[in-house]
Amino acid sequence: KYDMDKNDFILVDGNHNLSHNFVVDWDPYLYRPLGDKIGWEYYKKFLFQENDNKLKTKKFLCMNGSFHPHRVVLLNDLYTNNCLEDSYYSNNFGGEKFYNWAKVQIKIDWNEIWEDVELEKDFWIGNKKKLDGADDINQRLLNPHIKYFEDSYFSVVTETWFNNKTPDDLVKEYPNTPLKITEKTYGGLLFHPFIVLGCPYTLKYLRGLGFKTFPEFFDESYDMIEDVRERYEAVLENIIRLNKKSLEELKEIYDSVYDKILYNQRLFHDWDRDKLVSDLYEKIMEKTK
């Protein structure tokens, strides 16, 4: 319409399937790196705390601020498997109107994946469940509500993107691998052992950056599963298995890996965030030549 040349623009985004999601072939484009600067000064004050060795009252933390089908299905399955009573969880979507819409819409949008899913009416027609503002993205970036991390043993991170496949050859070079990883993942990474309901190869990418993951808690083979439903089932199985453990059993595992949490905090803390921005700027300038 405006006779603009696409080569006059460089789109910076975290969507590794961007070229498949738009009619226009957006090329070239760059990827936003993990560890953006937003909210970092507020996170720093909560780092490097000694393990208080207290018995926590909840097993895991799972925050769900906005609607995505995989979040609805996971919460639904956690409810039917009695996993939510001993957790801090939230869903900013619910009520009878939402239930009537979602039970149809999920199968329309993702029929090939969730065709057999039946939402539990008693759970979804209830009130939305919030964690004192922890699900508001602006509040969360300014204040991670550390109390929920301090009183639970691991995080279930429900990432924004889930129904995606990332070819293995894209995860060989670090740290510029095009994966959709948001503040949800690095929030969990900073304070907890964590499992991610997100894109395949997320853990592989994080390990490539130097972070430690937690096979002591989870069967992390789920990270390599490209089939969406199979990856989902593997994540769900992990959570159900851990939920069957007592708080005392989880504490024993948690205490044994606490040094890993501190290590991840140190690595994240020591990143040169100004360099992340300057490197991205240099790549943009290089593409304009």
Where are these regions (language model features)?
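Pol beta-like nucleotidyltransferase catalytic core
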Residues: K1-V156, N163-T182, Y186-L190, I195-K289
